[in-house]
From Swiss-Prot:
Residues 133-138 form a propeptide. Indispensable for the control of thyroid structure and metabolism. GO terms for cellular component: cytoplasm; extracellular space. This is Thyrotropin subunit beta. Pfam families: Cys_knot. Belongs to the glycoprotein hormones subunit beta family.
Amino acid sequence: MTATFLMSLLFGLAFGQTMSLCVPTGYTMHIERRECAYCLTINTTICAGYCMTRDSNGKLFLPKSALSQDVCTYRDVIYRTVVMPGCPPHVIPYISYPVAVSCRCGKCNTDYIDCIHESVTTNYCTKPQKPYLVGFPV
């Protein structure tokens, strides 16, 4: 191996974990309404990644505020609204969904963020799909 490659590898291993890997990441979600005929497939962005955190061994001697860990959370969010296709006239067809513009590592604010990852949640359609691209149904 060359010295340059070896130095690059060592540099990456040493400093790679210190950089924030909390970034907006592409995510596909499926939205259904019981009253509407179709399922809507939407591509958006969510905050995902890793944040540096420390887990202290002396938890009994620290205040509770020192025990909370940083999570990858939203810095800036915009909401987009789309029309759900195939809804009857008495149903409001508008759906708003979040789009992560920027992310940060910080404390999880449970007032507006779900801080728990539920692995049993499904993300699929049970009805025929209508993809949604750049604000226009296809």
